A protein has these predicted regions:
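Glycan-recognition and catalytic cores of secretory/periplasmic carbohydrate-active enzymes
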Residues: 1-400
Length: 400
C-alpha cells in the first residue's frame, strides 16, 4: 500500500460515475483528486497497470468531462493535470538501454525497476499496450514526448522480427530481445494483438495481447505499420494457433509452449476472448460490415476473417453456455485430435462448420477444478458488443 493512497478505485470509477450521472459521488471524487492525490510517494507501481488503470482512468474522465453535458465545467483541468503529472512519472520506466519499459517504477524517485521474477524480463504484452494512453495524451497536450517514448517500444519489437507476427511473451529491457519462445494470446500475451483505448480496468491485472493493440493503434493513429503488423499477426494466428475441437469442430485458439514449429497446447484463457471482436474490427476497418463490403479493399480474405470472428465468438459464448451457472471459467482445456496438436507443418487445416448442438459442445469443454473461477473479465462482452455493432446480428445481443 502507498503511504498516502493512490485512489485506484476512485480514479477507475470516474468514467462510470459520469456515464451514470452520479453527480454527488463524482463531486466528492473530484475534490479528493484535487486535494489529496499526490504521485510524489515512496512507492513502487507496475508500469502497465498504472498506465491502463490510473492514466487511462484520468484520460477517460477528461474526455467524458468535455463530451457529456452537465458532467463538469469545460474549463475543469483537474483530470488532465493529474494525467500529465502521472505520465511524467511513468516516463522513467522507458529510461532503459533498449527503450523497452521496465516492469515497474518508483514514483518519487522516478526510477525504472526490472521485474523481480521472470529473470528481470518485461512482459511483451505489458510493454506493447501502453501506447494508446500515451499517444492520446500527446494528442491533447501537444507534447510529443509521450508519443515518442511509446512509439519507440513498437519500433524495437517490430525490428526484432517475430516469426510470422507471433511474439514470445517476455523481452529484456536491457537488450531489447525476446527472452523466451513461448507464444500465447492469453495471460502475458493477449493485448499486443487487440482492449478498448482509454478504458479504465475495473480490476487489477487485466491482461491483454499485442495483436489486440495493433489493430486499435492503427484505428487510433492510421499509421500503416500497425495495419501491416496486425495483418501479419492474424495470418500467423490462423496458420499456427487456430484448431477445431474434436467433437463440435468449434474454433479455438491454442498455445505454443515451445514457439512456432512446436506442438500446440489446447488451453484457452478467458483473456483470449478479445480476439473475435478485434478480428472483426480489422476486417471492416471499424465500419459496419454492410458498409465495409463496398470498400475497394474488401476481398475473400476479409470474408474468411469475418467467418473466423463469428466462429470464435460462438466458442467464447459456449464457455458460458456449457456451465450450470452460466458463468465462464478462467481457463478451458479443449478436446482436440492429436493430429491437430502437432506443429503447423504436420497439421491439416479444417474448415468444417462448427456444430450448434450444445450437447456436443459439452464434450469439448474440459474445466479443471483450479480453473473453475470467474474474475468478471470483460473480453467476451467486448467481443459481443463489437460483433453486434459490426454485423447487426441480434444473436450477439441475446448472448450478451
Amino acid at each position: 500500500m502507498s503511504p498516502k493512497g493512490l485512489g485506484w478505485i476512485i480514479v477507475d470509477s470516474l468514467d462510470t460515475m459520469m456515464i451514470m450521472n452520479l453527480t454527488s459521488q463524482l463531486s466528492e471524487a473530484r475534490i479528493w483528486l484535487q486535494r489529496k492525490l499526490d504521485y510524489e510517494q515512496d512507492q513502487d507501481v507496475n508500469t502497465f497497470e498504472t498506465t491502463i488503470c490510473m492514466l487511462g482512468g484520468l484520460l477517460s474522465a477528461h474526455y467524458l468531462s468535455k463530451a457529456l453535458p452537465g458532467v463538469s465545467s469545460r474549463r475543469d483541468p483537474v483530470y488532465l493535470n493529474k494525467a500529465v503529472d502521472l505520465a511524467d512519472q511513468l516516463l522513467a520506466a522507458y529510461d532503459s538501454p533498449s527503450g523497452i519499459p521496465y516492469a515497474s517504477i518508483h514514483l518519487s524517485e522516478r526510477r525504472g525497476i526490472a521485474s523481480h521474477t521472470d529473470g528481470g524480463a518485461s512482459s511483451t504484452v505489458e510493454a506493447t499496450t501502453l501506447q494508446l494512453e500515451m499517444k492520446y495524451l500527446s494528442n491533447i497536450t501537444g507534447n510529443d514526448i509521450y508519443w515518442r517514448q511509446a512509439e519507440k517500444v513498437m519500433e524495437v519489437v517490430d525490428g526484432i522480427g517475430a516469426p510470422e507476427g507471433l511474439v514470445p511473451i517476455f523481452l529484456s529491457a536491457q537488450s531489447g530481445r525476446f527472452t523466451s519462445r513461448e507464444i500465447r494470446l492469453g495471460s502475458r500475451g493477449d493485448s499486443y494483438y487487440g482492449d478498448f483505448p482509454l478504458m479504465s480496468c475495473m480490476y487489477f491485472y487485466l491482461k491483454s495481447t499485442i495483436a489486440e493493440y495493433l489493430i486499435k493503434q492503427y484505428l487510433q493513429t492510421s499509421e500503416p505499420i500497425y495495419l501491416e503488423m496486425w495483418e501479419e499477426a492474424v495470418q500467423g494466428i490462423q496458420k499456427h494457433l487456430i484448431i477445431p475441437t474434436q467433437h463440435a469442430k468449434l474454433r479455438t485458439v491454442a498455445e505454443l509452449p515451445n514457439g512456432v514449429g512446436g506442438a500446440l497446447s489446447p488451453k484457452m484463457d478467458h483473456l483470449v476472448y478479445f480476439l473475435p471482436g478485434s478480428i472483426a474490427l480489422g476486417a471492416t476497418n471499424g465500419l459496419p460490415e454492410a458498409e465495409a463490403w463496398s470498400l475497394p479493399s474488401w476481398n475473400a480474405e476479409k470474408d474468411q476473417q469475418m467467418e473466423l470472428a463469428r466462429e470464435l465468438t460462438k466458442t467464447c459464448w459456449g464457455m458460458y453456455k456449457v456451465t450450470k451457472t452460466g458463468i465462464a471459467p478462467e481457463i478451458v482445456w479443449f478436446a482436440a485430435d492429436e493430429q491437430m496438436l502437432r506443429s503447423a507443418s504436420d497439421r491439416s487445416s479444417s474448415s468444417a462448420r462448427s456444430s450448434d448442438s450444445e450437447a456436443t459442445w459439452e464434450k469439448d469443454y474440459n474445466i479443471k477444478p483450479l480453473d473453475a473461477h470467474n474474475l468478471q473479465r470483460p473480453e467476451t462482452v467486448e467481443s459481443l458488443f463489437l460483433m453486434w455493432r459490426i454485423t447487426k446480428d441480434p444473436i450477439y445481443r441475446e448472448w450478451g
